A protein has these predicted regions:
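Hotspots on structured nucleic-acid-binding interfaces, especially in canonical RNA/DNA-binding domains
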Residues: 39-57
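Boundary/linker elements of alpha-helical solenoid repeat scaffolds
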Residues: 11-12, 60-62
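Conserved catalytic core of the tyrosine transesterase superfamily
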Residues: 2-44, 67-278, 282-297
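Short amphipathic alpha-helical interaction/hinge segments
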Residues: 58-61, 108
Length: 297
């Protein structure tokens, strides 16, 4: 297969001469005709997972693909047992196995999970021993935001920006990507809302609005007045001397502010960029807002 798809060299294979031309032809067809039709996320996942599998096979001198289903089953069982020894969750392991099966299927080589019911049951039993979900982010509830507002020193620009970040995040229930993408023209002060042009849950592509409280409006207004920002990104990078930059904050900088918040408030949990979103949802539930309305947020 093309180097575009495989980044691991000298991987053991056990493909019979009679199968080799078909396998090469199928993989070439995948590269030339099908690969670019897939979404970037799908391509990235398949490529990452399969190259990880190939690396495992190389390190353990096991044939990655074989004409003999029993050879493939031995390799795949060893790989499954390896994945089970890691900290990967249920769905991550299933995805990695699915990626291996995808390339076996493309090659039209025997799939041990299809050929052996016992191996399929073994795999399901093993994977089901793993937690099926990642632990949910600890919610930053409304009372924590109130504590933030009481404790944050908003005289320095970094403290004022923190207040804008956390209040906007819990009000709008925006994801980190939406927060970082806020521009001044997205903010409607009169109607107390912020427009997000893109959303993970917005299938229509029309964008969505997030509500902002009077407290948040006042903080944003103070931030704009102090910084002189008139257009462009709302949440800007700050230099070491707290000079406002033209560029928007990056994700790693946003995450660092959440970590700093834990130290400031002596929180017993480690907040993440998802904590304000979870906290906002919890608050909405407690205030009687319907599940349908929350799902649209």
């Amino acid at each position: 297969m093309s180097a575009m798809l495989i980044h691991v060299e000298n991987v053991p294979m056990a493909i019979a001469e009679s199968d080799r031309d078909r396998v090469i032809g199928n993989l070439r067809e995948l590269k030339d005709d099908v690969w670019e039709l897939k979404s970037e996320n799908t391509k990235r996942a398949y490529q990452y997972d399969f190259n990880q599998y190939l690396g495992f096979c190389k390190d353990n001198a096991l044939p990655a693909m074989a004409s003999d289903v029993n050879v493939t089953k031995t390799t795949c069982r060893a790989y499954l047992d390896y994945l089970m020894s890691t900290k990967l969750k249920h769905h991550s392991i299933r995805r990695k196995i699915a990626s291996v099966r995808y390339f076996i299927g493309v090659s039209e080589l025997p799939d041990p999970w299809k050929q052996s019911k016992l191996f399929a049951e073994y795999t399901n039993h093993k994977i089901n021993q793993k937690p099926s979900r990642q632990s949910q982010a600890a919610p930053m509830r409304l009372e924590i935001i109130d504590a933030i507002n009481a404790k944050l020193d908003t005289d320095p620009l970094i403290g004022l920006r923190d207040a804008v970040i956390f209040n906007t995040a819990i009000d709008t229930i925006f994801r980190a990507s939406n927060l970082l993408a806020i521009e001044i023209h997205h903010i409607d002060f009169a109607k107390q809302r912020i427009f997000a042009p893109r959303s993970k849950t917005d299938k229509s592509g029309k964008g969505q609005y997030g509500y902002i409280s009077t407290t948040t409006i006042n903080l944003i207004d103070k931030w704009l007045t102090r910084t002189g920002i008139a257009d462009g990104p709302l949440l800007r990078k700050l230099s070491p001397k707290q000079t406002v930059q033209d560029n928007a904050m990056q994700y790693h900088a946003l995450l660092a502010r959440y970590k700093n918040l834990a130290a400031t408030l002596n929180l017993e949990f480690k907040p993440s960029c998802h904590s304000t979103r979870v906290g906002g949802v919890v608050t909405m539930f407690e205030r009687g807002i319907s599940l349908d309305q929350i799902q649209k947020a």
